[in-house]
């Protein structure tokens, strides 16, 4: 296939689903060859090096209606910026980044992913790719719970005198909420 300029499109590997069939079915998740996307506007093109699997991945896949177009799942990822859209100012080629993607775009279970630069941060240098990939969605959920839903203030000493008990905080969100 050729792009809008008549140039041959580079292909990349991905894993996707065409419908929400039982996960034990050999066609529940399939290997794909997709066109490698190109960054424009506020996009970063990230070469994905690690992803995490969240409950949302299972729920979205289970709810898929049969389609001719595959759904590439995955929201949390770590990778290296390999291309930058013309409106991006905060990142450069080679940056190691992490992010939680968005539902309106293909997910992180692919070799290269387009991500809006406003959803991206530099990955912590003290974490491996796998460790950093486990952070974005759980950290956002924990943050939103504490500071947007429960009314705590995200500033040093702003919550003195307030008490919060987190029971069974052993999962991703609970672990982050305890640390926040």
Residue spans for each PLM region:
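Short structural boundary motif marking the start of a folded domain
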Residues: 8-15
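Conserved hydrophobic/aromatic beta-strand scaffold that supports enzyme active sites
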Residues: 31, 36, 78-80, 112-114, ...
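Residues forming the Rossmann-fold NAD(P)(H) cofactor-binding site
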Residues: 175
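Glycine-rich beta-strand-centered segment in the early N-terminal region that forms part
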Residues: 35-52, 62-104
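NAD(P)H-binding Rossmann-fold N-terminus in SDR/SDR-like oxidoreductases
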Residues: 54, 172
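NAD(P)H dinucleotide-binding glycine-rich loop of Rossmann-like/cofactor-binding domains
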Residues: 100-168
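N-terminal Rossmann NAD(P)H-binding glycine-rich loop of SDR-like oxidoreductase domains
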Residues: 170, 178
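Short, Lys/Arg-enriched N-terminal segments with co-localized hydrophobic residues
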Residues: 1-8
């Amino acid at each position: 296939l050729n792009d809008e300029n008549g140039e041959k499109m580079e292909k990349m590997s991905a894993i996707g689903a065409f419908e929400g069939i039982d996960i034990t079915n050999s066609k529940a998740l399939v290997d794909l060859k997709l066109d490698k996307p190109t960054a424009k506007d506020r996009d970063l093109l990230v070469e994905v090096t690690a992803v995490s699997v969240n409950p949302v991945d299972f729920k979205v896949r289970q709810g898929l209606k049969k389609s001719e177009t595959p759904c590439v799942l995955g929201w949390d990822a770590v990778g290296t910026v390999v291309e930058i859209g013309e409106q991006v100012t905060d990142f450069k080629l080679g940056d190691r980044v992490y992010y939680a993607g968005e539902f309106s775009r293909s997910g992180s279970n692919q070799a290269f992913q387009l991500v809006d630069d406003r959803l991206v941060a530099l990955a912590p240098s003290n974490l491996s790719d796998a460790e950093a990939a486990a952070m974005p969605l759980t950290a956002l959920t924990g943050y939103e719970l504490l500071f947007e839903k429960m009314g705590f203030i995200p500033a040093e000493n702003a919550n003195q005198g307030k008490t919060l008990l987190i029971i069974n905080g052993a999962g991703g969100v609970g672990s982050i909420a305890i640390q926040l």
